[in-house]
Amino acid sequence: FSPLAFEDLPDGRRVFYSGTGCGHVVCIDARTGQALWRFQMSYGGVNSGVVIHEDTVVAIHGKENVDSTVIGRMVAIRKPASLPGVGEEILVLGKEAEVWRNNSMEAFTSTPAYRNGRLYSTIKRGELVCVDAETGEDVWVLKLAPDQVHASPLWADGKLFVPMFDGRISVVVDEGDSGRVLGKTTLDGACLAAPSAAHGRVFVQTKKRLYCFGSPLPAPAFVAKPQEELKHLLTGPPIGSAVSLQVVPAEFALKSGTSQAFKVYALDRTGRRIEE
């Protein structure tokens, strides 16, 4: 399943963008679940995570395209200027929403990294490709392995950490017109996931081991964020009057002789709870 990319819109709504198993990129209201728009890319799943670049959403897939037999494509989709209101129909975006396409890109589940207007994507041929997010043109290409399936690159500390299917991981620096490998090693087991970074360390999971690279100093103790600090995502000053109701829980199972209590919240047009 595609990792979600969240965005807070000027109108107060919080949305997320994702690929779907039916070949679409979708925009969903994160508070209410309302589907706002969709754009079909392929006849198979869009399994990689999408990237937000200014007023576009960039996505890549590794299936057959809807308008040709070409396999794989990276596309920049322009976000619509206005979105449906509560209860209105989903927007179906067509080719007019396509800003650019790059037919040389094919990735099954690898999610691009994004930094300063550039996309860094590993593709099926085992290459790391730097793409200009404004134009869709390749900036540079590095061959790092025979092939690639699932793993994704990570941008951290001014460098790219790039795991590959054959167990190799490379540290790459973007030098403008080219990419340069600072170092590389081969790990035990295939790399299928994206690395993670925290407290000066990089964590890499293979099919056989979990590796930690970086600072030998003890990491600070983990402190969970108090739930109160996250309340602004659901509640806040109302924007207008209530426009919809939210029943909680939305999903439940009852056995004979049991009961279920519900809460009903009034939501404003941004999906925030304003009254119980």
Predicted regions mapped to residue ranges:
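Short flexible loop/turn segments that cap and initiate beta-strands
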Residues: 267-276
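Noncatalytic, solvent-exposed loop/strand surfaces
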Residues: 1-247, 252, 256-263, 269
